Every structure is written in structure tokens, then in C-alpha cells.
């Protein structure tokens, strides 16, 4: 069985055909997150640490750390801060150190900048996953020597110098090329995790079918583990969670062994809570004085004010159970166990009083 080993200093994550689905948490990424990028520019890593903790609590097995930021406020003093090749090699090791300080979860180092990858590898304790190489000649020549030097597994993305092909046969050929080139460096297939590239189903009706077919071929013909950006499948569609929740178990059934995704259901913001309170007040509804924000959002099905596992995690855990990758359903039962209410700890059926006894 193909098994890809990713390790922190004290913990091991296994990506494999016979293993529970591996969730690679994607939240630590300043791309498209303006507030996080601004905080990183100020040297504030508190959100990075909070995201790491929340994702592990939600069930992430590996944490992706992406350093893709530019420091716009510092550009005036030094134009190099507008260049990822300048910023990321400095930023990546600090982000990794902060994550390692608050969790022992294995890390996936995510950057397209070779200097950031190498500095991240130097800062990482254990055996991280490197994200990524592509079929582009320049990326292969820069990335594969790092993989060999540090003896780490790598994500191989199925695009090359011609871009991303909509033809699944072309994407398979690119993946095969990467596996073969890696072998030339002495890198085994079990240390390569192929991303066959998930297309948005809203733009390409065959996107789901393509991925399932590709994953089967990659497993059967190349013997490699696979991953994907799970939320890509639902991009641009309403109720994205509904699509994601169906896609992930189907991908698992086809043989996909991991996904880069957000395991956390984002908390309801204070602004949303205030909006709901105002809406109820306008309707003349009077809430109990002692009803806090969490009780309010639970009552009206808004979610939670606290980070918690997302619905996608529920779908993955159910699929692990159904595919016999969760022995005796232990993880499923633990995940769905309801915490006892205050004052009821230790009370079970035998603790009830006043019931009729059978003679």
C-alpha cells in the first residue's frame, strides 16, 4: 500500500490508500485575506496561531502554511516589499515557527518561491510536505532537488508550461512526467501526492467525473496518493457546502486520499448577531435577558459564535466510517458525542428517579 509520511517533531500523519482521509487545513494563507496580510506586515502572528489551533481542533491532520503576501505599506520605504521573492523567504520561517509553537500538527510548506520553500524546510521540525512542484521545467529543476535534499514528500500539480489543460488525459500525462522526473532524482512514488486539478463544476459540467476518473488512473497506473483544492469544485455556485459535502465522499470512493481545505465552520460575527437581535426587536419579539449570543445563534440555526468543525468534516468522517477506515466508528462516535449539560455529568439512565419499575 502506498503511504506518504508527513511528520512534526512528535506527531505523524499518514496519507494512504488504507488510511482515513487526510485533511490539510488551508486557512493559514494571506492570499485574499487582507486583514491577515496587514497583520503579518506589522509582525502580528496572532491570527496565524489562532487559525492553527482552530483547524487542529476541527480535525485537520496537516496544516498548510502559505506565505503569499506582499507588504504594501512598506513599499514606499523599499520597493522590494512588493515582490513575493523578497517577502516570502523572510516570512515563511517565522510563520512556521509560530505554528509549531502552538501545535504539534505536521506542516505543509506552501509557496511558489524557491527561497521560501527552502527557508521553510530549514525551519520545520520533522518531515513536512512540500507544496509544490508542477510539470513546468523551471519548477521541476528548482523543486525536485529540494525534495531530494531534505527527503520530504511533495505535492505535484498537473499543469505544465502550456498551462492547465481541460483534457484529463493531458493532466494525467503531466503527472506521469513529474513522477518519472522525480524517480530520476531518486524520489519514490510514495513521496509524491498528485493534485489532478479540480475544475469548477459551474464552468465545466464534467469536472467531477473527470476528477474521479483521473484519481482512479493515478492510483492504479502510477500508485500515487492524491489531493486537491476541495472547494474549487463549487466555485461560483450557491450553497457551496452542499456541493462540497457530496464531492468529498465521492472523491474518496474514487481513491482520493487527501484534500487541502478549510475544516472550520467560520463563526457567526458579532455584526450578524447584532443584526439578528435588531430584526427580532423590530418584530416585537422579546428575548430572555440572560440569552447570550451563542444561545441566540443556536436557537435560530445561524451556526455558532465559536469556530467548530465544518459540514465537510462531518461528510469526511461519515465516509471514513463507511469505507472501513474508522475502526468500530470510534472517530464518528466521538465527533457526534453530545457534551452533557451542566449538572448532568455522570447521570445516565440509572440516575433517573420516579420511573416505573418492572417487577
Language-model features: locations:
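Domain-level signal for soluble alpha/beta catalytic cores
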Residues: 1-193, 199-359
Amino acid at each position: 500500500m502506498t503511504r506518504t509520511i508527513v511528520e512534526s517533531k512528535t506527531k505523524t500523519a499518514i496519507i494512504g490508500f488504507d488510511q482515513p482521509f487526510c485533511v490539510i487545513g488551508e486557512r493559514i494563507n494571506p492570499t485574499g485575506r487582507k486583514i491577515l496580510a496587514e497583520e503579518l506586515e506589522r509582525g502580528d502572528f496572532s491570527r496565524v496561531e489562532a487559525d492553527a489551533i482552530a483547524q487542529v481542533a476541527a480535525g485537520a491532520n496537516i496544516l498548510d502554511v502559505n506565505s503569499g503576501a506582499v507588504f504594501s505599506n512598506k513599499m514606499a520605504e523599499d520597493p522590494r516589499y512588493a515582490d513575493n521573492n523578497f517577502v516570502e523567504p523572510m516570512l515563511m520561517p517565522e510563520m512556521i515557527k509560530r505554528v509549531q509553537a502552538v501545535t504539534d500538527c505536521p506542516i505543509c510548506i506552501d509557496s511558489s518561491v524557491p527561497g521560501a520553500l527552502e527557508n521553510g524546510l530549514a525551519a520545520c521540525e520533522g518531515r513536512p510536505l512540500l507544496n509544490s512542484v508542477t510539470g513546468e521545467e523551471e519548477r521541476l529543476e528548482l523543486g525536485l532537488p529540494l525534495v531530494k535534499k531534505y527527503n520530504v514528500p511533495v505535492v505535484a500539480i498537473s499543469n505544465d508550461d502550456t498551462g492547465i489543460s481541460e483534457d484529463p488525459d493531458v493532466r494525467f500525462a503531466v503527472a506521469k512526467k513529474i513522477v518519472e522526473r522525480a524517480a530520476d532524482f531518486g524520489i519514490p512514488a510514495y513521496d509524491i501526492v498528485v493534485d489532478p486539478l479540480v475544475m469548477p463544476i459551474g464552468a465545466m459540467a464534467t469536472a467531477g467525473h473527470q476528477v474521479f476518473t483521473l484519481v482512479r488512473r493515478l492510483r492504479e497506473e502510477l500508485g500515487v496518493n492524491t489531493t486537491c483544492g476541495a472547494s474549487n469544485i463549487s466555485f461560483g455556485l450557491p450553497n457551496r457546502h452542499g456541493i462540497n459535502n457530496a464531492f468529498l465522499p465521492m472523491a474518496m470512493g474514487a481513491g482520493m486520499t487527501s484534500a487541502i481545505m478549510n475544516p472550520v465552520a467560520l463563526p457567526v460575527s458579532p455584526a450578524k448577531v447584532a443584526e439578528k437581535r435588531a430584526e427580532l426587536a423590530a418584530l416585537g419579539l422579546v428575548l430572555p435577558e440572560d440569552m447570550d449570543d451563542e444561545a441566540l445563534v443556536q436557537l435560530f440555526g445561524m451556526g455558532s459564535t465559536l469556530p467548530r468543525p465544518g459540514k465537510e468534516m462531518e461528510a469526511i468522517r461519515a465516509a471514513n466510517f463507511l469505507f472501513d477506515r474508522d475502526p468500530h466508528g470510534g472517530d464518528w462516535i466521538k465527533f457526534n458525542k453530545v457534551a452533557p449539560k451542566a449538572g448532568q455529568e455522570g447521570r445516565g439512565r440509572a440516575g433517573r428517579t420516579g420511573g416505573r419499575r418492572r417487577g
